[in-house]
Curated annotation (Swiss-Prot):
Protein name: Xaa-Pro dipeptidyl-peptidase
Gene designation: pepX
Top-level class of the enzyme under EC nomenclature: hydrolase
Described function: Removes N-terminal dipeptides sequentially from polypeptides having unsubstituted N-termini provided that the penultimate residue is proline.
UniProt catalytic activity: Hydrolyzes Xaa-Pro-|- bonds to release unblocked, N-terminal dipeptides from substrates including Ala-Pro-|-p-nitroanilide and (sequentially) Tyr-Pro-|-Phe-Pro-|-Gly-Pro-|-Ile
Keywords: Aminopeptidase, Cytoplasm, Hydrolase, Protease, Serine protease
Localization terms from the record: Cytoplasm
Family: Belongs to the peptidase S15 family.
GO MF annotation terms: aminopeptidase activity; dipeptidyl-peptidase activity; serine-type peptidase activity
Species name: Streptococcus pneumoniae (strain P1031)
Disulphide bond pairs: none
One GO CC term on file: cytoplasm
NCBIfam families xref list: PRK05371.1-4 (NF003783)
């Protein structure tokens, strides 16, 4: 384990003493260090009647147990302090470590022995081996009462609200959209779990079209075969109009009653970060949105009608929209428990909705935590004039996602009444998708949140993985740079795939978000501020560094690609084409081994480089015909240890999100030997070689100069490493699988790779 502590706030000594005293640690500034440590530990072991026993089973050094040490005349030393501290954090002395000084250096332990009271205060705010901070572990065990009131420690809310005796209710928010054109505003179901509190509380809201269930069977039927010919497009300039949103006004009167009438029973799934905040005094709201089970309307996936309906839930929390008790719309209930302040959470589609909501500038949305979210839907299902699939899901497109998320069809009555209209709407969507050309058009323009990024007022926290080929890093990169300069923005850029990171051992992500939301949603005045970029170092396990920016580098390193012309044959023998189409993983393996139709260029790294931004290929290239698909991947090549893209379980169900509440696994990205690691990749239709909105002819056997930016990333390379650039045509995981007989030729002498560093 390595300690990477971003959540700790330096407080004045009087605040430290006061907070310690409230938790029963009655330490005196004038006492000597040894006495203070004993006082601290006897309170620490509050679950024991006889505190001599837990002291006797800890060690001060290799020869002395802690009780014996306190009974001796020996002085407290830095070595003894560290030895005790690590044992309190769950490390076994003489098993996990023997030399505390060596161990603290190896683990990056954040505490430097000096002022013992401040040391002990920071120790309580440090994460244990099992994933909780020490103070959270003690509170979970009953250090302070579960009195349904707020208690703060180091600028963070503690788990002092009951997660058993909570209010569970359902309301139906009246949206300002009518997606199915029935002349009535769509209703959106809101599932609420909130702690009991005599006052107003903030809300954690997760906008998830998956929450009420998904129609996997219908979605699978809507998948496309990826085999087909790359379209030869007519040259033209793509024209667009400003997206429009038509809103509807509230209709009719509804009796105001005091409480919701529908009780929330079981929910399909919760998000463990939300679970963590519930006993800390934050309501949990789960909203599936229009076109989902128990709501009304069509599934409009990603457009501002869908976003508006989610926004209207925040409006209801602030008294600007109505919520009914049921679908009759006869009785309404106010969110009189809400303080109006909201944070959004969730990954993938959930993070996408956070991005979209932020761009409305809605009042009350204080923070978004957008994890692996889409910023422009075109870049999810298309790339540079190509029809593409999200990584791992060949054949998926917007209409199959619509079938997946239109969960109203899971209710037989809704299916009978509404499926015909839903299918008619889906046919319109299919026509607008334009799978034929892969070009950007008005349909995608209406689902581009970057156009409204200037409206964002909330503080923004992103998480994204360098190995996320589902929602590719371009999404967070573009959103990060499109935000107004005056707002606070932060990015946790890890080396995983399309994954959550709130339960990783190496970083105090949950505690950092707690500090932020306690400040922004509960009004606690602290100096807490996250760095702009927190990056997971790819060269070592469990190592995180603060950076000033994502991209924007002034310096670059250029690699020449060679001296000769090389060709990429597009067509494969039928046997290989069928084999790759059946299992794209086989294609990826053979591509990395140099066995596919490809140009492979090994580039030795002659000095340390820190890539930060978008690698760019400048290629002189020609096609043997009037079309061309170019794929590129940049690898770090060579057998060595690399961080793996998916977290592994270190310890099962050891993280406590409250008081024995929603226990979850402690995880981390493994660091183990592999033959290579993908650094970045990209795909380009050569007819869109100069601009996404400009389609140009390709003249057979005529040279073209192409500038091709790959996916943005942050990646460290060391002298002696090897980069491998792979250029090819069809990518059997991502692109259309065109097996026509043509080839691309690259003049390597007139081509180069540029890395921002």
């Amino acid at each position: 384990m390595r300690f990477n502590q971003y959540s700790y706030i330096n407080f004045p000594k009087e605040n430290v003493l006061s907070e310690l005293k409230k938790c029963g640690f009655d330490l005196q500034n004038t006492a000597n260090h040894k006495d203070s440590l004993e006082t601290f530990l006897r309170r620490f072991f509050f679950t024991y009647q006889d505190t001599n026993y837990p002291l006797s089973i800890l060690a001060a050094d290799k020869k002395t147990d802690l009780l014996t040490f306190f009974q001796s005349e020996d002085e407290l030393t830095a070595d003894i302090f560290y030895t005790v501290a690590f044992q309190l954090l769950g490390f076994s002395y003489l098993v996990d470590f023997e030399d505390s000084d060596v161990f603290r250096k190896e683990t990056g332990f954040p505490i430097i022995y000096g002022d013992l009271i401040e040391n002990l205060y920071q120790l309580l705010n440090t994460r244990t081996k099992k994933g909780n901070t020490l103070i959270d572990q003690l509170v979970s065990d009953g250090l302070i009462p579960e009195d349904n009131d707020y208690h703060y420690f180091n600028g963070k809310s503690l788990a002092t609200f009951s997660n058993q005796d909570v209010i569970r209710e359902v309301v139906y928010v009246e949206s300002r959209v009518d997606t199915d054109q029935k002349g009535l505003s769509d209703l959106v179901k809101v599932s609420i779990i909130r702690p009991r509190f005599d006052g107003k509380i903030p809300a954690i809201m997760t906008a998830s079209p998956y929450h009420q269930g998904t129609n996997d069977k219908a979605s699978d039927k809507a998948l496309y075969k990826m085999e087909g010919e790359l379209e030869v497009k007519l040259p033209h300039k793509i024209e667009l109009e400003k997206p429009q949103l038509n809103l509807v006004q509230p209709q009719g009167q509804a009796e105001l009653i005091a409480e919701a009438e529908e009780k929330l029973t079981h929910i399909n799934s919760s998000y463990t970060l939300n679970d963590y905040f519930l006993p800390r005094g934050f309501a949990n709201l789960y909203v599936s949105g229009v076109g989902t089970k128990d709501s009304t309307g069509f599934m409009t996936n990603g457009d501002y009608q869908q976003i508006e309906a989610y926004k209207n839930v925040i409006d209801w929390l602030n008294g600007r929209c109505r919520a009914f008790t049921d679908h009759t719309r006869q009785r309404q209930v106010k969110a009189d428990w809400s303080n109006g302040k909201v944070a959004t959470t969730g990954l993938s589609y959930l993070g996408t909705m956070s991005n979209g909501l932020a761009t409305t500038g809605v009042d009350g949305l204080e923070v978004i935590i957008a994890e692996a979210g889409i910023s422009s839907w075109y870049n999810y299902y298309r790339e540079n004039g190509l029809v593409t699939s999200p990584g791992g899901y060949p054949g998926e497109d917007f209409d199959s996602l619509a079938e997946l998320t239109y969960s109203r069809n899971l209710l037989a009555g809704d299916y009978i009444r509404g499926n015909e209209a839903h299918q008619a709407d889906l046919e319109k969507v299919k026509a607008q998708l334009d799978r034929k050309t892969g070009d950007y058009n008005q349909f995608w323009h209406d689902r581009n949140y970057l156009l409204n990024a200037h409206k964002v007022k909330a503080e923004v926290v992103f998480t994204h993985g360098s190995q996320d080929w589902n929602v590719k890093p371009l999404h967070v990169y573009q959103m990060f740079h499109a935000l107004p300069t005056h707002i606070h923005k932060h990015l946790f850029f890890h080396n995983g795939a399309h994954v959550y990171m709130n339960n990783w051992q190496s970083i105090d992500f949950r505690e950092s978000i707690n500090a932020l939301l306690t400040k922004k949603l509960l009004g606690q005045e602290t100096d807490f501020q996250l760095p702009t970029v927190i990056w997971q170092d790819n060269t070592a396990p469990q190592t995180w560094l603060s950076l000033d920016n994502f991209g924007g580098q002034e310096n670059c390193k250029t690699f020449s690609l060679g001296q000769e012309e090389q060709a990429i044959q597009n067509q494969y023998p039928d046997k290989d084409f069928e084999r790759y189409s059946k299992t794209y993983q086989t294609f990826n393996t053979e591509l990395y081994q140099g066995k596919a139709n490809q140009i492979t260029i090994n580039l030795p790294v002659t000095k340390d480089l820190h890539l930060n931004g978008r690698a760019q290929l400048n290629l002189r290239i020609k096609s043997s015909t009037n079309k061309g698909l170019l794929s590129a991947q940049l690898l770090e090549f060579g057998q060595k240890k690399y961080l793996q893209p998916y977290p592994a379980i270190l310890s099962a169900r050891t993280i406590d999100n409250g008081r024995y509440h929603m226990l979850e696994n402690l995880c981390e990205l493994p660091f183990r030997p592999e033959a290579q690691r993908v650094v970045t990749k990209g795909y380009l239709n050569l007819q869109n070689r100069n601009d996404l909105l400009l389609v140009e002819d390709i003249t057979a056997d005529e040279w073209m100069d192409v500038q091709f930016e790959l996916q943005p990333t942050i990646y460290k390379l060391k002298e002696g490493d090897t980069l491998r650039l792979v250029l090819y045509t069809t990518d059997f995981e991502i692109t259309i699988r065109d097996n026509t007989d043509y080839h691309l030729t690259v003049d390597l002498a007139q081509s180069m790779l540029t890395l921002p560093c």
